[in-house]
């Protein structure tokens, strides 16, 4: 179902109902770009640490706009043994709500726009009809603006609310405004004495003059009139004064308050959908979903925090349970039978033996997708096939049970090992970002950091290390790269051989990370005062954290072919007998259809700790067959 600004409000109840009924959701996003600086290959270095990858994406990807959000809900029908789906395709755009609303600035990447255009993406639906949204801080500020308006209007009997700023004595009026206010008071006196006229429209005036009018009427006419600010077609603001009794005044105020709440909800817009997903506490599925999660939190909750640990805590509070199908397909028992984990190819592979495609049907009133037509890069369709991939893989896990299970639910313990682990693209030895605890810290004692002239190419590096067999090169920038050797004992030889080189420098990974950490500490020390001020106005989602144990799997190795060239590091006879180089170890609740999330982050943390202690058994998954290894479904701790 396509949702734009004009039909968002009328279909919001359908979205809420789908979220409430669903067993799990699948999501996907389309963006205005990926990287505003480095190329994608530089943005995803093979030896990034999780912290480094987070910082890169935060710095170079968050200024783009998530402007299409796909949501597909899945509910299992036990009677007919099939899934009922409801797909939504939301077009999102930060249209300013009023003159004081945030005027969001974002960037576009030409290659991304060109690609989406080639896929038939309709940009007019984004920019002309996109659904507005506010993050939590913007929503808070807008609510304060409404409260301020009600407070200012309180004195003239316009509101039943009490303002601390209401004047209880004559207002001090500037000399240049006294004549204007006297004329207004004179008109109101005529209105009150007239038996025919009930309303008085004042001429458009400035915000300061309107404030003086409200304050003056607050003191001079505490009862008997209703004061309201309206806007002309030309966006000029003016005041309307009406003669009313107390009952009529209260009725009008209730109408006005209801209208303001409706306007506020309209401004919060699409964020209400994200709040509903978060408040449900249900499993959210995505494919290679780290960027989707970062953009969702950044746009609809609050700017991303400075460090990875706080991002993890924030994310698990917003989305208690996440599952990445790309990670799932990349680990056992799927890794050996799935060669390509891209979404389109994965969906095709999971239709073949030994997998069984799930029986799926669109709910009445919702359009159905035909996977044969491959509507890729429409967010709603991508979310739909992501959900299909999850179902097929989850059901395959059920075949290892004794007795086998055809249907594995989203609450089965079989899929727990994959919870809250997000796939890290192109990282050699850290397959995922662990949202629920410390990230993996593989030994990189076989990795070297090399700096060299910017004229060097990949072939130059292969030539330099030609004497060391198979290597893997991961570029950092134009003048540096990581080089992974096949044998750790070769590291010290390479470092010693390059001591007297003039055009390049080689150091161990441990040395490089140590110096980088020292520089970071020095920088942090110099900016310590500003760091103290950074801990304010953070996320306050109303959520139920969900904590699970970590599960790991076995080690795998990576090699790359070497290229022999003229420039090389051939060890001397003396160096060939050196000792091994020193290794360096581097360091489900009821849906609440609320329009804001008022619970502070600290409360979410308390709930997280409580749930860790009170962790309940999910739906029984059955017993594992004796013939299958105990670690069959565990996510690896090394890659």
Curated annotation (Swiss-Prot):
PTM: Phosphorylation by MAPKAPK2, preventing GADD45A mRNA degradation after genotoxic stress.
CC annotations in GO: cytoplasm; cytosol; glutamatergic synapse; nuclear speck; nucleolus; nucleus; postsynapse
Reported impact of residue 113 to A: Loss of dimerization. Loss of activity
Consequence the record notes for mutating residue 382 to C: Loss of function in the presence of Mg(2+) but not in the presence of Mn(2+), Zn(2+), Co(2+) or Cd(2+)
Cofactor section: Mg(2+)
Positions bearing Phosphoserine: 163, 167, 530, 557, 583, 587, 619, 623, 628
Enzyme class name: hydrolase
Modified residues (N6-acetyllysine): 220, 499
Record note on cofactor: Divalent metal cations. Mg(2+) is the most probable.
Residue ranges of domain R3H in the record: 178-245
InterPro entries: CAF1_poly(A)_ribonucleases, Nucleotide-bd_a/b_plait_sf, PARN_R3H, PolyA-riboNase_RNA-binding, R3H_dom, R3H_dom_sf, RBD_domain_sf, RNase_CAF1
Region span, Disordered: 560-639
Gene3D superfamilies assigned: 3.30.70.330, Ribonuclease H-like superfamily/Ribonuclease H
Listed result of changing residue 326 to A: Reduced affinity for poly(A). Little effect on activity
Site feature location: Interaction with poly(A): 326
Basic residues: compositionally biased ranges: 606-615
Effect on the protein upon substituting residue 292 to A: Loss of function but does not abolish ability to bind RNA
Catalytic activity: Exonucleolytic cleavage of poly(A) to 5'-AMP
Compartments, as annotated in UniProt: Nucleus; Cytoplasm; Nucleus, Nucleolus
Gene Ontology biological process terms in this record: box H/ACA sno(s)RNA 3'-end processing; female gamete generation; lncRNA processing; miRNA catabolic process; nuclear-transcribed mRNA catabolic process, nonsense-mediated decay; nuclear-transcribed mRNA poly(A) tail shortening; poly(A)-dependent snoRNA 3'-end processing; positive regulation of telomere maintenance via telomerase
Modified residues (Phosphothreonine): 631
Implicated disorder: Dyskeratosis congenita, autosomal recessive, 6: A form of dyskeratosis congenita, a rare multisystem disorder caused by defective telomere maintenance. It is characterized by progressive bone marrow failure, and the clinical triad of reticulated skin hyperpigmentation, nail dystrophy, and mucosal leukoplakia. Common but variable features include premature graying, aplastic anemia, low platelets, osteoporosis, pulmonary fibrosis, and liver fibrosis among others. Early mortality is often associated with bone marrow failure, infections, fatal pulmonary complications, or malignancy.
Chain's role: 3'-exoribonuclease that has a preference for poly(A) tails of mRNAs, thereby efficiently degrading poly(A) tails. Exonucleolytic degradation of the poly(A) tail is often the first step in the decay of eukaryotic mRNAs and is also used to silence certain maternal mRNAs translationally during oocyte maturation and early embryonic development. Interacts with both the 3'-end poly(A) tail and the 5'-end cap structure during degradation, the interaction with the cap structure being required for an efficient degradation of poly(A) tails.
Family: Belongs to the CAF1 family.
Name recorded for this polypeptide: Poly(A)-specific ribonuclease PARN
Organism: Homo sapiens
Species lineage: Eukaryota, Metazoa, Chordata, Craniata, Vertebrata
């Amino acid at each position: 179902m396509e949702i734009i600004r004009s039909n968002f409000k009328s279909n919001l109840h359908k979205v809420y109902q789908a979220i409430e009924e669903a067993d799990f959701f699948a999501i996907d996003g389309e963006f205005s770009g990926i990287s505003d600086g480095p190329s994608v290959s530089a943005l995803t270095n093979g030896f990034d640490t999780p912290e480094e990858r987070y910082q890169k994406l935060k710095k170079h990807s968050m200024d783009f706009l998530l402007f299409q959000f796909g949501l597909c809900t899945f509910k299992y029908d036990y009677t007919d043994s099939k899934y009922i789906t409801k797909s939504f395709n939301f077009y999102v755009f930060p249209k300013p709500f009023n003159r004081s609303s945030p005027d969001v600035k974002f960037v576009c990447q030409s290659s991304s726009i060109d690609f989406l255009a080639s896929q038939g993406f309709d940009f007019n639906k984004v920019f002309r009809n996109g659904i507005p949204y506010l993050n939590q801080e913007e929503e808070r500020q807008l609510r304060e603006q409404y409260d301020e308006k009600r407070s200012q209007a309180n004195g003239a009997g316009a509101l039943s609310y009490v303002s601390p700023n209401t004047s209880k004595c004559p207002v001090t009026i500037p000399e240049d405004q006294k004549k204007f206010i006297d004329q207004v008071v004179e008109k109101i006196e005529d209105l009150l004495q007239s038996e025919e006229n009930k309303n008085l429209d004042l001429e458009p005036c400035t915000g300061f003059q309107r404030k003086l009018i409200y304050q003056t009427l607050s003191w001079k006419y505490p009862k008997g009139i209703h004061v309201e600010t309206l806007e002309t077609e030309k966006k000029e603001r003016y005041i309307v004064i009406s003669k009313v009794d107390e009952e009529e005044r209260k009725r009008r105020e209730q109408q006005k308050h209801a209208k303001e709440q409706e306007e506020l909800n309209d401004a919060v817009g699409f964020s209400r959908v994200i709040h509903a997903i978060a408040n449900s506490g249900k499993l959210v599925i995505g494919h290679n979903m780290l960027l989707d999660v970062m953009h969702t939190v950044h746009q609809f909750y609050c700017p991303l925090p400075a460090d990875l640990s706080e991002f993890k805590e924030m994310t698990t509070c917003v989305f208690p349970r996440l599952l990445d199908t790309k990670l799932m397909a990349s680990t056992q028992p799927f890794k050996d039978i799935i060669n390509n984990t891209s979404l389109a190819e994965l969906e095709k592979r999971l239709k073949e033996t030994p997998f069984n495609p799930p029986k799926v049907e669109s709910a009445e009133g919702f359009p159905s997708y035909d996977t044969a037509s491959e509507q890729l890069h429409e967010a709603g369709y991508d979310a739909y096939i992501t959900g299909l991939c999850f179902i097929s893989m989850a059901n395959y896990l059920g075949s290892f049970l004794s007795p086998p299970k055809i249907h594995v639910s989203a609450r089965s313990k079989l899929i727990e090992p994959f919870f809250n682990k997000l796939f890290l693209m192109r990282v050699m030895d850290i397959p995922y970002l662990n949202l629920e605890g410390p990230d993996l810290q593989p030994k990189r004692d076989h990795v070297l950091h090399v700096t060299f002239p910017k004229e060097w190419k990949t072939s130059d590096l292969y030539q330099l290390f030609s004497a060391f067999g198979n290597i893997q090169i991961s570029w950092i920038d134009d003048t540096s790269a990581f080089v992974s050797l096949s044998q750790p004992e070769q590291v010290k030889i390479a470092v010693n051989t390059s001591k007297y080189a003039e055009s390049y420098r080689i150091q161990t990974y441990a040395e490089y990370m140590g110096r980088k950490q020292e520089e970071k500490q020095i920088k942090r020390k110099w900016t310590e005062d500003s760091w103290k001020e950074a801990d304010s106005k953070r996320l306050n989602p109303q959520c139920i954290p969900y904590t699970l144990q970590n599960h790991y799997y076995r080690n795998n190795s990576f090699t790359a072919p070497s290229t022999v060239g003229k420039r090389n590091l051939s060890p001397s006879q003396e160096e060939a007998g050196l000792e091994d180089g020193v290794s360096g170890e581097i360091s489900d609740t009821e849906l609440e259809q609320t329009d804001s999330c008022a619970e502070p982050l600290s409360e979410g943390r308390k709930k997280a700790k409580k749930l860790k202690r009170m962790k309940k058994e999910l739906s029984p998954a059955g017993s594992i067959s004796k013939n299958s290894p105990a670690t069959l479904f565990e996510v690896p701790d090394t890659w």
